[in-house]
């Protein structure tokens, strides 16, 4: 199992820094050719990345990334939104009380948000009480407004920490980024003007638990450190390394994309912004296991080809292709020139696409230029075909040709409502829907008759009202009687003038009104 661990790390180190597995390895440096005997052929050592001259090994401790470290470092936090609930009451003349609730926003302070979060996490009843609607106050024939401020805590709110600059990333932040938590700034602004984001753990230090301490052997030549053998037994060269900080920790980014923190006496330049670190997840670990099996299979094929060469005492271009080094590093290259077996020292590099080494027809790119051929023969079984095309007799396995994108992070368990822009930015400052679910329902309510009197006062008022009602009824009846009395008298005198007649002494009937009009004297 240990050789397997040593086997795949160099290959995957170079491949993962590009996000793809290499399909081939080819020398970027090729030494002079020299003739050799058939017995000098050997299968390459794909277990280690060899470096020249560094034979002095001494134990030391270093720091590296944890196994299974993923690209997105999760930082748990919470959002805090300030909400003002306003109760407006109006009491009319007869005592009916109408209450209307309204909600608006205000920008909270970090200290108040931290206190509210601690209350919520501790189960303190003060947090739930702070969310209740205000108890409305009221006065007769007046409008009274009662307000109450509440802090809505929504947790968890998970953000991603960038290990390179310690910035925080979330769709809830303006522009998707927050510069980070510092001593002077303990919160992040959000897309919502009245909501701030704060980490669960107070303080300027953000969680960055991605490192582990390991022990290995330092490979040096005099005072110069060439590389080291990690605790898994794999040699790693410091050639081409650059300085890079992760979560504020200074370390070295190696050429294979791995990162270590170790002390060196050599001055190393800083990495350019595009130089990142290989970030492995569990999916890539599964692929690496399959790559190990494939490389072991290639090792067996190389040994079979070497055994066939020794047995038959003959060499072919196809058999020479099995002797190629499969991982980046120092090795040998073989070819046949004019029926003579030739060998050269070579330093191999990874190839991502065939266009890198075959940019045009008939060109095999080695060391940045087209490599010359001898009678149509290059090396490691690569030849020039009759049609002028470069023919490579073998490729890496189909598994190594897959262009697999590594999983970036685990799934966030909760999608914070601020991540959806449609939930915010209403017109005005009315409370948005995403906080309404965390508050009691508000509604318009109308109370019964209530003038603010005690129970005995209510009965006194009812009795007085009844007495006043009786007095009004009696007064109305009396007024009606007095109004009808003169009308009845007028009817009794004026109503007989037309119908009553008088009789004179002579017996003649004379109408009474006519006697008055004629001025006659009537004697009764």
Curated annotation (Swiss-Prot):
One of the Pfam families matching this protein, by short name: Rhabdo_glycop_FD
Signal sequence segment: 1-19
Membrane-spanning segments: 460-480
ATP-binding recorded as keyword: no
Keywords for this protein: Disulfide bond, Glycoprotein, Lipoprotein, Membrane, Palmitate, Signal, Transmembrane, Transmembrane helix, Viral envelope protein, Virion
Known uses: Primary surface antigen capable of inducing and reacting with virus-neutralizing antibodies. Almost all human and veterinary vaccines are based on the functional aspects of the G protein.
Protein's name according to its UniProt entry: Glycoprotein
Membrane topology term: Single-pass type I membrane protein
Family recorded in the similarity comment: Belongs to the lyssavirus glycoprotein family.
Cellular compartment(s): Virion membrane
Additional information: Arg-352 is highly involved in rabies virus pathogenicity. Its mutation dramatically attenuates the virus.
Residues on Intravirion side: 481-524
Disulfide bonds: 43-302, 54-226, 80-113, 178-188, 208-247, 242-271, 363-370
Post-translational modification: Glycosylated and palmitoylated by host. Glycosylation is crucial for glycoprotein export at the cell surface.
The gene coding this protein: G
Known function: Attaches the virus to host cellular receptor, inducing endocytosis of the virion by using different host proteins including TFRC, GRM2 and ITGB1. In the endosome, the acidic pH induces conformational changes in the glycoprotein trimer, which trigger fusion between virus and cell membrane. There is convincing in vitro evidence that the muscular form of the nicotinic acetylcholine receptor (nAChR), the neuronal cell adhesion molecule (NCAM), and the p75 neurotrophin receptor (p75NTR) bind glycoprotein and thereby facilitate rabies virus entry into cells.
Superkingdom of origin organism: Viruses
Residues with a covalently attached lipid (S-palmitoyl cysteine): 480
């Amino acid at each position: 199992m240990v050789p397997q661990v040593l086997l795949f790390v160099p290959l995957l180190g170079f491949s993962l820094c590009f996000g793809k597995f290499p399909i081939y390895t080819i020398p970027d440096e090729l030494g002079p050719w020299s003739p050799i005997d058939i017995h000098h052929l050997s299968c390459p050592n794909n277990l280690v990345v060899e470096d020249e001259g560094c034979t002095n090994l001494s134990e030391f401790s270093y720091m590296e990334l944890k196994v299974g470290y993923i690209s997105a470092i999760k930082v748990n936090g919470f959002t805090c939104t300030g909400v003002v609930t306003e109760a407006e009451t109006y009491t009319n003349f007869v005592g009916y009380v109408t209450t209307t609730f309204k909600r608006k926003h205000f920008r909270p302070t970090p200290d108040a948000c931290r206190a509210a979060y601690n209350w919520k996490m501790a189960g303190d009843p003060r947090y739930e009480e702070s969310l209740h609607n205000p108890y409305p106050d009221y006065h007769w024939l007046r409008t009274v407004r009662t307000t109450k401020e509440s802090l809505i805590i929504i947790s968890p709110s998970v953000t991603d920490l960038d290990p390179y600059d310690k910035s925080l990333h979330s769709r809830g932040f303006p522009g998707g980024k927050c510069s980070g938590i510092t001593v002077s700034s303990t919160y992040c602004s959000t897309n919502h003007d009245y909501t701030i984001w704060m980490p669960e753990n107070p303080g300027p230090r953000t969680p960055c638990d991605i490192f582990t301490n390991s022990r290995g052997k330092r490979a040096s030549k005099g005072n110069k450190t060439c590389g080291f053998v990690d605790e898994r037994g794999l040699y790693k060269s410091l050639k081409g390394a650059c300085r890079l900080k992760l979560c504020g920790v200074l370390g070295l980014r190696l050429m294979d994309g791995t990162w270590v923190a170790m002390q060196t006496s050599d001055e190393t330049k800083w990495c350019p912004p595009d130089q990142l670190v290989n970030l492995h997840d569990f999916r890539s670990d599964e692929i690496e296991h399959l790559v190990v099996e494939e490389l072991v299979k290639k090792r067996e094929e190389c040994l079979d080809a070497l055994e066939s060469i020794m047995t038959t005492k003959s060499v072919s271009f196809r058999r020479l292709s099995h002797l190629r080094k499969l991982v980046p590093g120092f090795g040998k290259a073989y070819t046949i020139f004019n029926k003579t077996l030739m060998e050269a020292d070579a330093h191999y590099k990874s190839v991502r696409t065939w266009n890198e080494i075959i940019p045009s027809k008939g060109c095999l790119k080695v060391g940045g230029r087209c490599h010359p051929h001898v009678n149509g023969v290059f090396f490691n079984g690569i030849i020039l075909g009759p049609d002028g095309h470069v023919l490579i007799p073998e490729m890496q396995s189909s598994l190594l040709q897959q262009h697999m994108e590594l999983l970036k992070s685990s799934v966030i368990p909760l999608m914070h409502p601020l991540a959806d822009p449609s939930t915010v930015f209403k017109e005005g400052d009315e409370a948005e829907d995403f906080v309404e679910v965390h508050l009691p329902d508000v509604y318009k309510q109308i109370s019964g008759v209530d003038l603010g009197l005690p129970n005995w006062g209510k009965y006194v008022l009812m009795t007085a009202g009844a007495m006043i009602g009786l007095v009004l009824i009696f007064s109305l009846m009396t007024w009606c009687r007095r109004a009808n009395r003169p009308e009845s008298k007028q009817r009794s005198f004026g109503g007989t003038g037309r119908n009553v007649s008088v009789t004179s002494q002579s017996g003649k009937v004379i109408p009474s009104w006519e006697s008055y009009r004629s001025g006659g004297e009537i004697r009764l």
